[in-house]
Amino acid sequence: KGCSRIAFIGGPKKLFVTQDRLTGYEQALQEHNLPLDSQRTFFADEFLEEKGYNFSKQLFKHDPQTDAIITTDSLLAEGVCNYLNEHQLDVPVLSFDSVNPKLNLAAYVDINSLALGRTSFETILQIINDVKENRQICYRQVIAHEIVEK
């Protein structure tokens, strides 16, 4: 919605979830003819609030005109929001699965954690049964999600 200097703060780069969300971020920038700036892309080795805070600090030293931040996790988002509040910066933050209702996120993707956990467990049980019966089956499940704008 009018932002052009959008940062990405993700979890460990080796995780598929981080890579998938990074790919989505890069594709969105490309679709809107926005530059990809590696100085606005960060990867935490752990999903911790302090990592989001510290990356925000680095980000605004490099680019004080950053006008939106996407995080891959609500803990990282919490650190980002704390930094923004502390420095009285009005920058929208978008994240995945907002577990803290007090976070002032512009929007988040509700990944339906309950259904994700239940489906994962059921799939693991099915795989165990298939292995016992010498069956090899490829599983793919899509869990419904929702974008929640505040």
Give the label of every model feature segment.
Residues 57-150:
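Flexible loop/turn connectors
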Residues 4-6, 67:
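Short acidic/polar active-site loop segments enriched in Thr and Asp
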Residues 9-57, 70-78, 96-98, 110-119, ...:
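Hinge/beta->alpha junction and helix N-cap segments in small-molecule ligand-binding domains
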